[in-house]
Amino acid sequence: MRKRSFGVAAGLVTAALVLSGCAGGGGDGAGGGGGDDKPYIALVSKGFQHQFWQAVKQGAEQAAEEFDVEITFEGPDTEADVDQQLQQLQTALDKGPDAIGFAALDSQAAGPYLQQAQDAGIPVIAFDSGVDSDIPVTTAATDNKAAAAEAAKHMVELVGDTGKIALVVHDQTSVTGIDRRDGFVEYIEENAPGIEIVDIQYGGGDQLKSTDLAKAILQANPDLKGIYGSNEGSAIGVVNAVTELGLEGKLTVIGFDSGQAQIDAITDGLMAGAITQNPVGIGYETVKAAVEALDGKELPKTIDTGFFWYDATNIDDPEIQAVLYK
């Protein structure tokens, strides 16, 4: 159905949402697309291969239940498949949803599709990763530059203010990839000019590819003091490379996101720490924003869903446990 006005119940994203546990990955979330008596919101994410997206889906489903709307939740097979994601976005548009949530793999490529949505009067909510467009009515996401700067701050604290480090980043086309790279690099340049960033590689968020890239970096730079992985797949790839080369305890690894593998790596001392987002909150706030847009409410241009640094010293704190996803 289209442009149905309905009231929005008050609701805040709390730790209870996350503590309820993550649903398994898959194609559709609640509902199947455009029921007769509920507004329909189509969500197109960046993928399903990481536990992060399963947690985003869970938050979206919780909001759908709370606000009595129907949603679908889809994403490409990998976070490198921009073409598949755009096909899914077109399919979502063809269903005539009341609103669309979109997490862009490429911040520029989706422009014509977003224009279709605007021309059809379909409000677009960007989530996790924004786009180079003013068409989305809001973006629900982590402040990725600030989060990456926080990761860099801890890198400096751990390796000192001199030496060589490197980055394995998930991509250089999405806003998240760009911001998590630039936020980290800019902090190092401004606050620790004695640290040299010897390499930045892009692994598409793929764990195996990131492992190979990290191994090549480590073999080319035996005096490396630290590596930063910018998302779940990148960070675990770095951990795997360190383990396979027998370099445990010889350099500092800092990650981004959560997931059981990173939690285990921190607990086991293979990773110094990581930034965790609030993925359930991202999914929840995306659906909530769509509901409010359909009800004619004015939304802020960004909805900051927050981030936290976690390591072995605070991983069991209730505040951290509430935003870790497994």
Language-model segments: residues:
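A residue-level marker of the well-folded mature domains of exported/periplasmic proteins
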Residues: 2-8, 17, 22-326
